Amino acid sequence: MHDSTGSWELPEELRMLRDTIRRFMVEEVKPVEDKLPHDAYTLEPEPLKALQKKARDVGLWCLETPGEHGGAGLSLLGQCVAAEEAAKCRMGAYIAGCGAFGFDPPVVAWKGTRHQQRFAREDVENGTKAFVAISEPSGGSDPGRSIQTRAERKSDRYVINGTKIWISGAGMAKWGIVFARVGESKGRDGITSFIVDKSKPGISLSRIPVIRSYSPYEVHFDNYEVPIEDRLGDEGKGFAFAEEWLIHARPPYAAATIGIAQAALDLAIEWAAQRKAFGSLLADKQAIQWMIADSEVELRAARLLVYQAAWNADLGRDIKVDASVAKVYGTEAAGRVVDRCIQIFGGMGVAQELPLERWYRELRIKRIGEGPSEVHRMVIARDLLSGKRVGA
């Protein structure tokens, strides 16, 4: 990301990717989304398929999926650039690009056997999606100890019993990856991951009523049988199998919140430049100028932290701490920026003809998802206090 002069900028191919997604969002996605109800969670099947075809035609399909499996195979830095731009729509907090770019299967699925990849291949082909089930009613931030869902080995299969909670996308998905405890171990070594097929008996869903534009589920397993060939990795090694994937999900997650906040700031700047109060433009008032300036400072800093984490990952470095730093600062800064933007708009800031109040609600959850800020602060502090200093 540095050229011979020592200046810092994105590689040319990623600038081109950013500009292509930005144009696609403005020219293709926004006109479709503008016709939807304010709190719509998904597009209807026909307009979604039409958008997905257009995205495929310009090479913007399943951006995280490796090229050999039909996706764009972006680096983690590329995924962050794409995530920021694809989030700049009303439903961007949970459905990037309104689903136009497909729904990448969990990357960990590609580490499985060809048989285990069957559902992931269908998702890439058909634009459908999967779910990942880790959190439980007993806890989510410490899954190694809180997972109570059990998988009991019986001959050539496992029988799963238990409940998962806060599972995004489970209602739309045909399959998922579930983490369950096998054997007597109480810690991470007892966790195994499995491919689960929603069409088989023994699995049921119940929707959790939360904010209007978000639809998580409880996923219940009642003597659900999984053949041994659908166990991902070795028994008791579920987290070891997926740990890198879970860590690498954090920079793009933070990047998406930055994209939403940037879109909010762009709206606020445009509003301040034309709205008058007390005889002059809002943009001429120091209070407004400082809110805009503070927002710009925070977004630039957050973006660079995300890019640093992704860049280090692409170089093969351990980014456990970098990812936590980017996730904490990115999600919290994004929330502060949208809060300021609502203040700049005044009463219009919570009007449903604008996306600001929806973004405000949804960004609040982002400080909890993918690990709450407090847990990531623990990760950062332990690194600093250990004397090993894995981070930068």
Spans of model-derived segments:
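Glycine-rich phosphate/pyrophosphate-binding beta-alpha loops
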Residues: 140, 165-171, 211, 248-252, ...
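A short core secondary-structure module
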Residues: 148, 156-157, 161-204
